[in-house]
UniProtKB/Swiss-Prot annotation:
PANTHER family the record matches: HOLLIDAY JUNCTION BRANCH MIGRATION COMPLEX SUBUNIT RUVB, PTHR42848
Binding positions (ATP): 12-13, 54, 57-59, 120-122, 163, 173, 210
This protein's encoding gene: ruvB
Keyword DNA damage: yes
GO molecular function, one term: four-way junction DNA binding
EC number: 3.6.4.-
Localization terms from the record: Cytoplasm
Protein name per Swiss-Prot or TrEMBL: Holliday junction branch migration complex subunit RuvB
Keyword Hydrolase: yes
Catalytic activity: ATP + H2O = ADP + phosphate + H(+)
Region of interest (Head domain (RuvB-H)), ranges: 247-321
Length: 321
């Protein structure tokens, strides 16, 4: 079952920029950068993608490698615990290869410093030996492209961030774009889906393709059990309501956060640490997963004194301000 799921996940990923839906400005610019690099016969400039989880950072890196006709090596910041881990990867890269580092903001400082000469000069500085007898050896690397992905660009050090030639932000997707993504995924998965069914799932997907595809799978389960010929708006609405996903895509935790903020703290302001304790949730989870969409919807405000619920949040929760 796990292997089947992984195959489905891989098959629904766009392979080219033409297949990729949304992020129009980013795609247009990336197309230019790719074409220019191919024309010069050089590796692409190092690229940093940042934005909320599930918006397509990994997919874009895979598309870059495919369009350039090079291999892609994947790793993540937390995995690179020692400088030797990164050095081993860098020395094995072929000419023009793409190294993708997810959660690059979580790389240890010692590992990060190994990247500086590698990114600028395609050289690796290694220290051989210890104490007075230690010496530095320079190793030439093949030209490569580093693609970093992060949900928290503010946690990247300036020296690392400034070494990226291309820095692009991924935005939340519109409901119309998500409906197109849902229709594309449904076609690949062999799910019969009506136009209004796609729209219903798209508008409840929190502006995020990963969530849209996940909701489609769960709605498909309901359609299968109910022996429905197609996923309609009515079926999708009923299934998502049973999953505690409301008409704007807010789930149980979103509503709990707003409810606690309004009922326990009179709408705020309240510090995020206090709010996290009251919601029995991690601070980072609130900041990375829940807050961005609530702010995007206009339900939550960040102020110097803490988080505040907006009048729109009171109305959505059917509570009096």
């Amino acid at each position: 079952m796990m292997m089947e799921q992984e195959c489905v996940d891989d098959s629904i990923r766009p392979r080219t920029l033409d297949d990729f839906i949304g992020q129009e400005d980013l795609r247009a610019n990336l197309r230019v950068y790719l074409q220019a690099a191919r024309g010069r016969g050089q590796a692409m400039d190092h690229t940093l993608f940042y934005g909320n989880p599930g918006l397509g950072k990994t997919t874009l890196a895979q598309i870059m490698a495919s369009e350039m006709g090079v291999n892609m090596v994947c790793t993540s910041g937390p995995v690179l615990e020692r400088s030797g881990d990164l050095a081993a990867i860098l020395t094995n890269l072929g000419k023009g290869d793409l190294l993708f580092v997810d959660e690059i903001h979580r790389m240890p400082v010692a590992v990060e410093e190994v990247l500086y000469p590698a990114m600028e000069d395609f050289k690796l500085d290694l220290v051989i030996g210890q104490g007075p007898g230690a010496r530095t050896v320079k190793i030439d690397l093949e030209p490569f492209t580093l693609v970093g992905a992060t949900t928290r660009i503010g946690l990247l050090s300036s020296p690392l961030r400034d070494r990226f030639g291309i820095i692009s932000r991924l935005e939340f997707y519109t409901p119309a774009e998500l409906a197109c993504i849902v229709k594309r995924t449904a076609g690949i998965m062999g799910v019969s889906l009506t136009e209004d069914g796609a729209v219903e799932i798209g508008r409840r997907s929190r502006g995020t393709p990963r969530i849209a595809n996940r909701l489609l799978r769960r709605v498909r389960d309901f359609a299968s059990v109910q022996n429905s010929a197609a996923v309609t708006a009515a079926l999708a609405s009923d299934a998502l309501a049973r999953m505690d996903v409301d008409e704007l895509g807010l789930d149980q935790m979103d509503r709990k956060l707003l409810s606690v903020l309004i009922e326990h703290f009179a709408g705020g302001p309240v510090g995020v640490k206090t709010l996290a304790v009251a919601c029995s949730e991690e601070v980072r989870t609130i900041e990375d997963i829940y807050e961005p969409y609530l702010i995007q919807c206009g339900f939550l405000k960040r102020t110097p004194r803490g988080r505040m619920a907006t009048a729109k949040a009171y109305r959505h929760m059917n509570l009096l301000a």
